[in-house]
Each structure stands twice: as structure tokens, then as C-alpha cells.
Amino acid sequence: MNENKLLGLAWISPYIIGLILFTAFPFVSSFFLSFTDYDLMSPPVFNGIENYRYMFTEDTLFWKSMGVTFAYVFLTIPLKLAFALGIAFVLNFKLRGIGFFRTAYYIPSILGSSVAIAVLWRALFAIDGLLNSFIGVFGFDPVNWLGEPSLALMSVTLLRVWQFGSAMVIFLPALQNVPQSQYEAAMIDGASKWQMFMKVTVPLITPVIFFNFIMQTTQAFQEFTGPYVITGGGPTYSTYLFSLYIYDTAFKYFDMGYGAALAWILFLVVAVFAGIAFKSSKYWVFYSADKGGKNG
């Protein structure tokens, strides 16, 4: 028995070591660094809550980047989940070649976070890019998608929305698990297709909607590659997400103490947002009837 335990520990030890070295240690050390003035050139100097005081009272870029991040999240999540659920609903039908389309819609989720796709997206939305060439065929003037502050954030948002495949794959089995008897009962009551979708399908898959909402929101708050490669946070900070601000502070200006403080604020924002979502879920997330209906 002891040999089995030792063997088990030996197998999981690489994961435990990696967790300690690359997750737990940076997590704890960043908390202490957030109370210091540290530029990598000299030892950290404790400065109390000065980083946080400056952040909330003097740093206008902090509030600007936080506002852009919330705008990005509130634009991205509803659109992405709506697309994912809509496409999953269509792919749930038994049609010829449906397997190909399921794969095709999922691929962007695998490739979407790569630098190569971000470069391609930048070329697509450039002033002389493919999108402007396409609308030029219909007589429209070129649009400066990435140079206009009012359009740049939407252009970056579309990249995130395009990566709806992972959420779609999670929605698909949930739709397949909705009991057919529920639809039959609704049809007998004279419900339309739209009413069946809203009154039967959606309530029965709310646990999956909630899961996707939490996962996608957490990822959206931490989005970095797309905005960094496509616009670099511009123009005029219109796409300057909070993650870009953390990166620039820590690795461009080497202000590690302040960068750590910013990272902890982002962590707290995501934690509070998730906490509110979990707290409110008891009012709109429904579980199977054999578990008592609402999540208590």
C-alpha cells in the first residue's frame, strides 16, 4: 500500500512541482511585490500602499484602461454566447455533412488566440485590407477600421466573438440532452418554435449557459494577444485593455511593483465579478426537476 502511494506521488510530483514553482510562488510573491517599489535593477523597497493610493487617486490611465476593458467584456460576452448558442442550435439538427460544419466552426477557437491570426486580422481590417477591398466593390469608401477610436474596439471585439467554437461545443451536448418529451408537451399546449426555445430549451440549459458565461468572462478580462498585435492599444488608448497596461508597466517600463499591484486589482475585479455571477445564479439558473428545480 505504501509503495502504491509512493508510486502515485512520483507520478503527480511533476505537476505539483510545476504548480508550486509556476503558479503558487508567483501568485504569493506578486502580492508582496505589489507593496514595493521594484524596477529589477535594485532590490524591492517596501512602500506600503503607495502603489494602490497612486492607482486610485492619480493614475488616469488606470481608469481609462479599466473602462475599455469593461466595454470590451460587455460587448464580447453577449455576442459570443449568442453566436455560440445559435450555431449550436442549428448544428443540433441531423443534416448531411453536419460533422464538417461542427469542425469548421470549432477551428477558430483553436487558432484564434495565436499571434498569426491576430496579424491576419490586422491585415484584414487595414485601410488597404481585404474588408475595404470587398466593400469597395459596392462603391463604398475605405473605412479606417483600426484608426478610428469608435471602430477600433469593435474590430478587436469581433476577433474574440469569432472564436465562439469552444462555447458552441459545450452548448451542443446540452441541447442534445433536452428531453424530447418537454418539446412534445409544449407542442400540445400550442407553443410556437420561438416559445419552445425560450420557455423549454433555454431554461433547461441555463447551467451550461452559466458555465460558459463564467469561463468566457474570465478569459475576456485577461485578453491580451489580439489587442496587442492588432492595435497595440491604440488609437488614443481606445483598445488599451487592462492586461496591456499591466504588460507595459511591468515589462516595458520595468515597474514591477506597480505592475504587480495592477495585476492584483485585475484578479480582484474578476473574483468580484464571478462572485456576483454565482450569487445571482440562484435566480436564473435551473437544474433538472429531480434536483428540485432552482439552484438553492
Q: Where is each model-derived feature located?
A:
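A structural signal for multi-pass alpha-helical bundles of membrane permease subunits
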Residues: E3-G296
